[in-house]
Amino acid sequence: MLNIVLVEPEIPHNTGAIARTCAATGAKLHLVRPLGFDISDKMVKRCGLDYWYLVDITVYDNLDDYFRQNGDENIWLATTKGSLPYTDADMTGNVSLLFGKETAGLPAWLREKYPDRCIRIPMISEARSLNLSNSVAVITYEALRQQNFPNLKY
């Protein structure tokens, strides 16, 4: 099972696009509060199009709540502060990919707690980061590639 965890997402368009990616890939979407929008926001719904019925979504009050319910086995933290290329991470089996909020990324305490689980998408040094929904899509499809695209058709 592939789990996409958005920690304090701020932009409804991004979350909607990520929900659509989750719907198309069978990944479960986890949202960790606070959210920068109402989950019923029309922009969230619009970006997810008519795929919402395919999205398995759970909302948590905070990261402690998320970890209490899901544990921390086989997690990967997507961060511009990571040193491990995302393609070098073993994303087979039941994996959770954590992504931080658009303006600040994942909290420092979380990165410090799991320094060997911080992965990065390579880019030119002048670029700070990719759009959140693009980052989720890139790493999601790498995880699915490593898992031989379970339940997906060409």
Positions of PLM-derived features:
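Post-transcriptional modification and biogenesis factors for structured RNAs
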Residues: M1-Y154
